[in-house]
């Protein structure tokens, strides 16, 4: 009932806003089909449903980039959906032409006050459209607000919210319901005893502790140039249960780890959610501290913040506004990075489509993504530019070579034969090999 109510309110709003039954039916059918296809593919790739924040990819002009992520195994599904939409549009348009009732509610904008019928019709037309949008908005916001009347009604009718686990919520309540419930985002619940006095007390406490820890230290981190590299979907495969190789897949990294300071990171996501890990690495803020409805800070939080904090600002404070630079060998608007990195204070974000684009954009064999070696060269160029400067800097790199979907891109892939893992599905083996 909860899922039906959400879809019914959307359909009703379309009918009353357009005042055309068949046009609204066409828009609703096409939108629902596109939503279903996109949701299915995203679940397949990321084990996540479509959320409202994903619409920023479309509004930001990233539709083409998103389509490049569609796996070949889903292409037939996409083609079938396109054929369905074409036939559905033809049928809906034909019915619109054949049906003599062009308007759902009688109104006349050309002669609004010609007679009582037109006056009443126009008033009712406007009120119905506004009321339908208000009802839909109230329903959507109520689903995401515990304690609201809508929330209580939904709970009484089988709604089982799991906003901390979007895929679980979608499976339990329907993807459309999950989408609507996330339309209102509350970044964080207000902690008990939260006040300016409390925060100043905490700041003083940890400043004193930091002073004690650093008492015997002569240098500062900002005395050095720091490069933060977030390697797309990188991990040590030999640590994954059930995965085995006849040769070491990361000998160079393992050698570096054995000869210098190194360690392990507990990641909140594996094989996806890169932007969330990136946000947490840059800010030090754990997503566990936020409200369950905040799923992607880069899309839902940072663009709306006035002065968000990030670690690169420590270098900016000491060396000026040009002390931090970022590199991402893909489109700048993906996850709104162009907006977010500007908010963080980075002097420039070099991407494939930035005003000053990246020079090193080579790919390996048939891979569609810029190789890691090319991305590293972009960072080395920034270091070379700094040689004559007495200032240190913070450099941020987010790579793309290992981004999904995975394909048979590489001619000399020794890991395909070296994979001696057992009890793997065909899909798992393919992902590991490629």
Predicted regions mapped to residue ranges:
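Transmembrane and membrane-interface helices of multi-pass
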Residues: 1-165
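Short alpha-helical interface patches
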Residues: 46, 55-64, 177-187, 192, ...
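Alpha-helix initiation and N-capping motif
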Residues: 55-58, 172-179, 196, 250, ...
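Residue-level preference for non-acidic, small/hydrophobic
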Residues: 61, 226-231
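N-terminal post-signal-peptidase region of extra-cytosolic proteins
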Residues: 72, 209-213, 247
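Membrane-interface segments at or immediately adjacent to transmembrane helices
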Residues: 141-228
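Solvent-exposed soluble domains appended to multi-pass membrane proteins
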Residues: 214-217, 231, 236-434
